[in-house]
């Protein structure tokens, strides 16, 4: 059985055919307070960071090498944002035990959406083009990085980025945003929204296990109960 192979011209033709019929799958994110979440490994001046790595080794799944596009990664859920960050750490270093001090060093950040944001749903896009969805999630970033650059180049004035499903946690969505020329900034830091995991409290009960009886979950509980990591308290 023949497998799908990434051929740029074939994907381009498919995308342009959908665009010609106004069938590019899209989603809207409405304005609001504390709409998006983002993990940061230390306290930065802002969570709204459009990173543009140059070296291929520094590029994420949707970063085009060479620093061509600044990309802001975020998620609908703190759980998904954390799963993306710590799932990569597990794959890179096999780390499942974290010293309790990490809870005070790593941050969950909240982002406000200050204008309506429109993104391309790349999962639905690939479904429409009969591109296997594992092409968006495997260890080879060639296709996803090309796709991001292509969509930005051809649709960057119409959309603010892309939406996709986390391969680490199938809960809500992840986003890779670009800066849209000619429009005001879409995102701002939620006032007081940079919180170390040590003092973070989650209220989204949709992510809690059925047996969870409390109405909130601490950052430490998220690590252990939802992400299956262990927090180790070292002797002082």
Task: Describe every region a protein language model picked out.
Residues 2-60, 91-236:
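Active-site and NAD+-binding cores of ADP-ribose-processing enzymes
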């Amino acid at each position: 059985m023949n497998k799908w192979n990434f051929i740029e011209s074939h994907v381009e033709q498919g995308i342009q055919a959908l665009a010609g019929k106004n069938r590019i799958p899209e989603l809207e994110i409405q304005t609001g307070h504390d709409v998006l979440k983002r993990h940061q490994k230390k306290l930065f001046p802002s969570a709204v960071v459009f990173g543009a790595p140059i070296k291929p080794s520094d590029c994420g799944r949707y970063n085009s090498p060479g620093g061509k596009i600044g990309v802001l990664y975020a998620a609908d859920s703190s759980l998904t944002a954390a799963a993306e960050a710590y799932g990569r750490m597990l794959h890179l270093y096999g780390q499942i035990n974290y010293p309790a001090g990490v809870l005070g060093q790593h941050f969950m950040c909240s982002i406000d959406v200050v204008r309506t944001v429109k993104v391309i749903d790349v999962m639905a896009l690939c479904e429409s083009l009969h591109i296997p969805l594992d092409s968006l999630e495997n260890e080879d970033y060639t296709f996803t990085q090309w796709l991001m650059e292509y969509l930005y180049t051809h649709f960057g004035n119409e959309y603010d980025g892309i939406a996709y499903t986390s391969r680490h946690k199938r809960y809500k969505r992840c986003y890779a945003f670009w800066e849209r020329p000619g429009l005001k900034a879409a995102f701002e830091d939620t006032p007081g929204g940079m919180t170390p995991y040590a003092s973070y409290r989650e209220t989204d009960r949709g992510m809690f296990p059925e047996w969870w009886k409390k109405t909130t979950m601490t950052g430490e509980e998220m690590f252990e109960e939802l992400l299956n990591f262990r927090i180790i308290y070292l002797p002082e």
